[in-house]
Amino acid sequence: MRHLLLALLLLGGARADDEEKKEDVGTVVGIDLGTTYSCVGVFKNGRVEIIANDQGNRITPSYVAFTPEGERLIGDAAKNQLTSNPENTVFDAKRLIGRTWNDPSVQQDIKYLPFKVVEKKAKPHIQVDVGGGQTKTFAPEEISAMVLTKMKETAEAYLGKKVTHAVVTVPAYFNDAQRQATKDAGTIAGLNVMRIINEPTAAAIAYGLDKREGEKNILVFDLGGGTFDVSLLTIDNGVFEVVATNGDTHLGGEDFDQRVMEHFIKLYKKKTGKDVRKDNRAVQKLRREVEKAKRALSSQHQARIEIESFFEGEDFSETLTRAKFEELNMDLFRSTMKPVQKVLEDSDLKKSDIDEIVLVGGSTRIPKIQQLVKEFFNGKEPSRGINPDEAVAYGAAVQAGVLSGDQDTGDLVLLDVCPLTLGIETVGGVMTKLIPRNTVVPTKKSQIFSTASDNQPTVTIKVYEGERPLTKDNHLLGTFDLTGIPPAPRGVPQIEVTFEIDVNGILRVTAEDKGTGNKNKITITNDQNRLTPEEIERMVNDAEKFAEEDKKLKERIDARNELESYAYSLKNQIGDKEKLGGKLSSEDKETIEKAVEEKIEWLESHQDADIEDFKSKKKELEEVVQPIVSKLYGSAGPPPTGEEEAAEKDEL
């Protein structure tokens, strides 16, 4: 997998950025789009602010749900109703984004996901019931776009203005297709994603802002909900350089939860003979409680898991100890040390050469993980300065500040490096390298090749990434043909192959026949995994339509609630001798009671009525009540619509 890492330079005059500053992009936000949780930050008044959502939480679950009433929920509200609506609550879209249907990790994941994942155009798509008996299929990009929209709205509510530009982070191990799909998700959400940067590097930026002196080797250990990355960075006089990176795109807190779940499912089967897996809702209830218990075990030694009417009416009650949790996951915990060992080897450093260890991601709160890291580094304490949940968004916000043209960032400029070698296949399946690993990008390299046989009319250019000498052991990125080569003996035609990588790590490969000027090229992101511009446009329109539908639905619900609260408020006041009940003649009281009961009955059988119906029913009720109350109060004022208003009127 080709991925980019960032080197951070402190330059006196940030010339590279002056170009970008010419375009006024407004406030650029930094978004950590996580597998399980997302976080948004902004560079404001010379410092980073991590922004809390409407629930007051600084991290937002990367969840989207569709209720039977046709309402779409995003974030906390979606996660909170997971147990009651598992088939239509979508999470872990990041596990699917930019991947093909046949990807073994996709096939592995869909076994555990409670919602339906289907194949469409050789890619995984998510199928849910969006209410009213309607089924809809979404690309993972669309689900991620909904989460990004939530983060965008969170920032807009805080800033009090529109946000259109963002820096979004991805795991260092994301390949081109996954990076491009993440950018597409931004486009669908109405965001111009100015940069895609790697999570561990973003964390290092957050960490590096306060520690600009001296020469240091920093190891970033990032274990989140779904991915694991280790990066080794060096800082020398304010220059960050990424020396090596490693990890596992498929290891995180959710995998630890899964182990505990499997343990309790087996235990329950052993005790009762019943298989809980048959009941999606029971499994999801267990998942929620297991996650809670896991968090509790970071600060205490045991946690109770209690679930009322867990399965077939029976309750569930078990204790999970920290020791048992560690035992169930010990192989996974220990496996995190292999990538650490690998980055040290790749960068020719000894354990004792590491100056700082930075722990990032919620799973690094697990005491056993902290202990293993500490033991690996012979007792060295990891740094505690950064909130592990927010470090990535913090770094993204710093980079967003640079792109906003915010002077207070001290003219930081980011340079990317490409830590996997890129090349093409030549005769015998040999990997011929054009761009070596750790080359600073943007970059451009060319080399002349020729034909392998006489009168060969076509050459096939196969583009690979990886460090192995034979292409079969490396990762194929894309293939294209250069045709129309005039007949000539082998070795005579001159074919120039050019590799070019831009700042976002998107690779373009061109082949040109120097004799004829014939050219062909490939942009590696445009493989079969990439959404077409038409699909993106359709998804953007869908997203807007959803926003419009959400607004209409909210207006309808508001109108229903207004009628309902008006009717019940009147009912309460008529029944209260201290209020209207004690002031009305029995005839007037009966008139209002009858009208109110009529509306309440109508409401019960017309929950799905139109906004106009709710409004007209409220008006009908007002027309009955108004003259009676006006007569009572001796004025033409409107009737009391609630107890507070009634109290205010009494004071008048």
Curated annotation (Swiss-Prot):
One of its GO terms (molecular function) is misfolded protein binding. Residues 407-417 are annotated as: Interdomain linker. Pfam families: HSP70 (PF00012). Residues 642-652 have a biased composition (Acidic residues). It is found in: Endoplasmic reticulum lumen; Melanosome; Cytoplasm; Cell surface. Coiled coil: none annotated. One of its GO terms (biological process) is negative regulation of protein-containing complex assembly. A motif (Prevents secretion from ER) lies at residues 649-652. The interdomain linker regulates the chaperone activity by mediating the formation of homooligomers. Homooligomers are formed by engagement of the interdomain linker of one HSPA5/BiP molecule as a typical substrate of an adjacent HSPA5/BiP molecule. HSPA5/BiP oligomerization inactivates participating HSPA5/BiP protomers. HSPA5/BiP oligomers probably act as reservoirs to store HSPA5/BiP molecules when they are not needed by the cell. When the levels of unfolded proteins rise, cells can rapidly break up these oligomers to make active monomers. This is Endoplasmic reticulum chaperone BiP. It comes from Gallus gallus. The gene is HSPA5.
